Amino acid sequence: GVGFKAGVKDYRLTYYTPEYKTKDTDILAAFRMTPQPGVPAEEAGAAVAAESSTGTWTTVWTDGLTSLDRYKGRCYDIEPVAGEENQYIAYVAYPLDLFEEGSVTNMLTSIVGDVFGFKALRALXXEDLRIPPAYSKTFLGPPHGIQVERDKLNKYGRPLLGCTIKPKLGLSAKNYGRAVYECLRGGLDFTKDDENVNSQPFMRWRDRFLFVAEALFKSQAETGEIKGHYLNATAGTCEEMMKRAVFARELGVPIVMHDYLTGGFTANTSLAFYCRDNGLLLHIHRAMHAVIDRQKDHGMHFRVLAKALRMSGGDHIHAGTVVGKLEGEREVTLGFVDLLRDDYIEKDRSRGIYFTQDWVSMPGVFPVASGGIHVWHMPALTEIFGDDSVLQFGGGTLGHPWGNAPGAVANRVALEACVQARNEGRDLAREGNEIIREASK
């Protein structure tokens, strides 16, 4: 007989290994699978493990030149999803050697690059990844992290306040700087470029950077507080992005910004390295995330994108608001907020956390609550997010009937009132509106 047998093979034989004991160095993934009708869950789970690691659809003679057992992904557990008739969570373990060190890009290409178009599946969603210390230690992570940022800004014991400058498109650089100044002068810690403000005909990046820097230093001198504006360095090429970051450093501003999903992880990691080497903080916006994470049964959950960002590097990242959404959503949001800022996060399925994650002292990222929030949400936000967060009010500041500065004052006063009330032991959930009403006098 021939030693090599060609043909299409059953994935289950090689890639479904329920007896496998996961290694401390394995990268683990939890996938929410919806197989096509008639495809058994084990076959689907094995197919996911195969297609995202060493497998191909047929036996090839070159398989004999390597040790599949050493390099293959393994589906080691499958559980049905409660309340869904044909949906399963498949757990896959990947050997560490499948991944390039320090490359989020390669990690994602391997795990989610190919398998999502797989015919035997109707839908697939990466719910969570367990990043082992052996891999996370090959990343430098956030340029500075929560603690260092507080020290640089000299702001402690409260959330930080931000505001996106609106109208996001159409202001001249001079007027844009003016709006920045008003907000910072009124009491905000940060203002922000909108994610789609890059370098358009009505306002070129260099002009904006210059006038914003002027606004920063003026408001800083007048308030005696350190101020920042997230200067968006996102650009069409990595070289252009770096040029903008370098100019920001030359101006002496404290922080720049990047759209990490549209800009890409490779660009983001380069920028994070530059920021670390040059003392710039890095604010990350998640434009495009909903394209990837909005559908429950297909795509990638935001907690995976959040973990990837913490590895790639960023000091702040947008993380939703929680206010006014469903209870369950609140728990899940708090789950990935903790994954961003804590050192050690226990597995907790009620919060959507499928694996215990140990970051081994990789710096944490400030979660940014932003989008449709205003001063009356302040008690809830303070309670939900705690001190280590950035609360961002766009229209909630600039929409103030008296203008930007009074809007900023209102937000700062409300925040200080909520923090004080909490520290005095009052119940923010119950007395929130009363606290704001008193403060507004």
Swiss-Prot record:
Substrate binds at residues 164, 168, 286, 318, 370. It catalyses: 2 (2R)-3-phosphoglycerate + 2 H(+) = D-ribulose 1,5-bisphosphate + CO2 + H2O; D-ribulose 1,5-bisphosphate + O2 = 2-phosphoglycolate + (2R)-3-phosphoglycerate + 2 H(+). The modification N6-carboxylysine is found at residue 192. The record marks 325 as: Transition state stabilizer. One of its GO terms (molecular function) is magnesium ion binding. It is found in: Plastid, Chloroplast. The disulfide bond which can form in the large chain dimeric partners within the hexadecamer appears to be associated with oxidative stress and protein turnover. RuBisCO catalyzes two reactions: the carboxylation of D-ribulose 1,5-bisphosphate, the primary event in carbon dioxide fixation, as well as the oxidative fragmentation of the pentose substrate in the photorespiration process. Both reactions occur simultaneously and in competition at the same active site. HAMAP family: RuBisCO_L_type1. The basic functional RuBisCO is composed of a large chain homodimer in a 'head-to-tail' conformation. In form I RuBisCO this homodimer is arranged in a barrel-like tetramer with the small subunits forming a tetrameric 'cap' on each end of the 'barrel'. Belongs to the RuBisCO large chain family. Type I subfamily. This is Ribulose bisphosphate carboxylase large chain. It comes from Hemionitis engywookii (Fendler's false cloak fern). The gene is rbcL.
